[in-house]
């Protein structure tokens, strides 16, 4: 009877051990899954944080010196247009003169009937001139100034566009390095723990000394990488604070929905050529240059002015306030330059070459934009797959590290394998973070090239 009980007892213990053997991997797997999910950092801002950031972005732009400088340039262009319009209005001038005759040919003649017409004279007067016709020279000058003003408005918008892209890039940089900084600090901590375990094994004679040397090398490598990331973060943060001093440095990336992007190559290239702000500026400069060519041609022709002049004078006294006589003149002034030493021809040639230069610049710009758009599209078309691939690689390395940690507790797993798992995890983390940054930045760059970034930021901040 006792033997029967002992046999049943041994069978019962065997069953319990078997059950524990099968349950333990399930528990380990569950623990592994939860652990690997928890190490993945939250890289993107939520909706409310993004909205607040875009609002702050708009405020930072209008306070930035680059924007204020563009405002000053725009104000100058407006005044240049006013100057171009001025010849169409009456030109009023006031003048005065006093004359003291020093010598005259009449003084040497002995004639009773001849005398100098002027001896001493003091006069003052007012002159009013009104342009009648100048073969459209003033019209061309006004059109040139107006097109340059419109070009300056586009330049201001482009500066805002570039400034917004620079600020967003700075946000992505600070967020990327901040995320990696936290991951690397955690990794250095784990490197230190593993190295300490290896040191204990070496001192107790259970592992060769070379393992401790390799562990110290891996630890130093992790610390150096952390130092590099911290330096990059400090540099990115300093640039961020210069651009946006009133905003807290980004700790997460500002996202961009892929559905907001244009993915059709032909459509995007056409949109870029038609709506790119640099192209718009050059087109307006070309129009202004054409008006300048027409203006230089019209300068070969004469000008007609209507003049009205009134004089008060005293024909007998030098430097006197008693101006007893007056004259009033009304006439038409005909003015033309017969010979200028080749100046007008040179001015015309310069105007033509400026027009040619702008045309060539536009062609070059169109090629550069087309190339940039094609490059961005090739990156954006595979963006989702790349993001998922790098996230999967990060999660897989996280699971591998967790599995090795769990196996270390139950078997004699090499601690150097744990260090290698830590290195693989950090490398996959860097790839994941920088790939996410690259994808987001490509989207915002497309918006900037298409001239849509300013409106996108304004709408996203509402």
Where are these regions (language model features)?
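Small/polar (Gly/Ser/Thr/Ala-rich) solvent-exposed segments
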Residues: 68, 91-113, 118, 129-158, ...
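Hydrophobic, lipid-facing positions within transmembrane beta-strands of outer-membrane proteins
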Residues: 122-128, 268, 328-334
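Sec/Tat signal peptide C-region and signal peptidase I cleavage site
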Residues: 24-30
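Bacterial N-terminal signal peptides
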Residues: 14-24
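A short glycine-centered flexible hinge/capping loop motif at secondary-structure junctions
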Residues: 202-206, 408-412, 449
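Periplasmic alpha-helical coiled-coil/stalk elements that build and connect Gram-negative outer-membrane
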Residues: 2-3, 10, 32-37, 43-51, ...
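Extended amphipathic coiled-coil alpha-helical segments
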Residues: 68-87, 129-131, 137-172, 176-200, ...
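Bacterial Sec-pathway N-terminal export signals of envelope proteins
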Residues: 30-93, 103, 208, 244-287, ...
